[in-house]
A protein has these predicted regions:
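Solvent-exposed, non-transmembrane regions of membrane-associated and secreted proteins
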Residues: 22-151, 157-160, 172-227
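Short, charged beta-turn/beta-strand-edge "cap" motif at the junction between a beta-strand
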Residues: 161-165
């Protein structure tokens, strides 16, 4: 092999090494940028905290309903919830409580649960509660994962059976420890609001899962609208 060939071979190796290093650096920068973009926006407004257990259930949401409450006739139960600004679009089904008093949540992370022993969305008073999983057991994000990106004034449309849709505007979003659950989150009286709840990081397997909740509050665009 001539000196010229050796020099060319050395330059080729150097170029290859430089290209590899550059690729690694760019990859690290790309990952760092992605993680920065994944940081949720700062919370805003004042929202009554509500707790969701590691299984996606609001812990201690309400005592088991009485027979009278369970037999209540619903005028316009919700069927679908949409937040166009963040791409949230979930079917809604009515849910109750477990024997422990925990609110149940549909297993499918694409489906939201409406607490059917509380007010309906569009009711004249009280807090209508919708709950959804943040993700599935396989790590796929649920529809309610989009709540982390809502902004003040984003519209929340709830489509109802046998009635016109009701539209709300987001007024608050808060991340709270899941063991903080004031009764106001599930109140049946007072000004009408829509409360949407999901789990929130951090995820701590040794403590059973997510240790916080994301709670979004939205007020009706027309407070006079009812079912």
């Amino acid at each position: 092999m001539t000196d010229t060939s050796r020099r060319r071979g050395g330059r080729a190796v150097a170029v290859a090494v430089l290209a590899a290093v550059t690729a690694v650096v760019l990859g690290v920068l790309w990952l760092a940028q992605g993680r920065q973009q994944a940081v949720p926006p700062a919370d805003f407004g004042a929202v009554p905290p509500a707790a969701v257990s590691d299984t996606g259930r609001p812990s201690g949401a309400a005592p088991p309903p009485s027979v009278a409450e369970g037999a209540a006739v619903r005028q316009a139960p919700p069927e679908r919830v949409l937040v166009p600004a963040v791409g949230l679009d979930a079917q809604v089904e009515g849910v109750g409580v477990t024997q422990r008093g925990d609110m149940t949540v549909p297993d499918d992370p694409a489906v939201a649960g409406w607490y059917r022993y509380g007010p309906e969305p569009g009711s004249a008073e009280g807090s209508a509660v919708l709950v959804g999983h943040l993700d599935s057991d396989t790590g796929d994000l649920g529809e309610f994962a989009a709540l982390r990106d809502v902004r003040p004034g984003d519209t929340v449309e709830v489509r109802r059976a046998g009635a016109e849709p009701v539209v709300h505007r987001v007024t608050a979003r808060a991340t709270v420890p899941k063991d903080e659950l004031p009764p106001s989150a599930f109140r049946r009286s007072g000004p009408p609001v829509l409360t949407l709840i999901t789990c929130a990081p951090p995820f701590e397997p040794e403590r059973g899962g997510y240790t916080a909740n994301l709670v979004v509050t939205a007020e009706p665009v027309d407070a006079r609208q009812g079912p």
